[in-house]
Amino acid sequence: MKLSNFWIRTLTGILFLVIMVFGIIWDRAIFTCLFGIILTVALGEFYKMALGTRFRFQQRLGVMTGIAAFLLVAAYCFFGWDLRWLVIALIPLLLIPVSCLFLPSREGFGDLAYIYAGLLYIALPISLSPLLMMDGDVYDGWFLLSLFIMIWCSDVGAYCIGTAFGQKPNSRKLAPSISPKKSWWGFWGGLFFCVGAAIGLHYLTWLPFPLLHCIVLGLIVGAGGVCGDLFESIWKRHFGVKDSGNCIPGHGGMLDRFDSSLVAIPLAFVYLALIDLI
């Protein structure tokens, strides 16, 4: 019997949720493998959207740079490697311009900038994630999981409130030229759910910060998640695609699932670093 798209989307979503929770909290090696795969697939999707089959060798060098940077940051955080090992990630990065000297044609040469754009947009935020995973010498994935829970709650709130109130003819759209279905109702609903999740996680002690900072964190993560979602929508409109890929049945590509976190989690990291809480 053929499953409907609703059930495919639901079952895939549950499986995705289980893998994410298990991969984040269980063990540092499992986390490293999981997020290494996420980075590789998401970056590959971005390069495929932007460049197609052009500059394939340079695309591979870009993916190698991203995964090397992530693995070396993880090795520094989890296993005490010297941070100077990060220079290894410079090898494939520097090979990108060198390899361009041997291109048979310079047509579309400016599009090579997408290689570096993908590293800044995808590889850099994911490479920051191991820095949030240690409590002294003890591996602790609950904080990063809490940030993802806040993002997921924001998505649920935006969908529920936006569907209930934001699709009426007179409702104001958030960014109609980028994502016509998103409304201000959905934005405020997502923000409310995100802050509510942050407060709940604070009382569960998963967010070990003063309540005021948890509320601010909820606002930052909620707003940052919307920015990440809209930013990916701009890319997809620019490249003329509906989804970044199809590796997650019913949900599109890997980049579609992590677009919010690519902005929200780095913003949370910067905020907590500035107030000296991490």
Enumerate the predicted regions with their spans.
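Membrane-embedded alpha-helical bundles of polytopic integral membrane proteins
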Residues: 1-220
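Hydrophobic alpha-helical membrane context
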Residues: 21, 57, 167, 241-244, ...
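Residue-level signal for alpha-helical context at structural boundaries
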Residues: 29, 64-65, 249, 253, ...
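Acidic (Asp/Glu-rich) catalytic motifs at the cytosolic membrane interface
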Residues: 39-50, 151-165, 188, 223-263
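Hydrophobic transmembrane alpha-helices of multi-pass small-molecule transporters
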Residues: 70, 194-195, 257-260, 264-265, ...
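A short, terminal or domain-edge coil/loop segment
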Residues: 88-89, 115-123, 225-231, 261-269
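Juxtamembrane boundary at the C-terminal end of a transmembrane helix
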Residues: 270-278
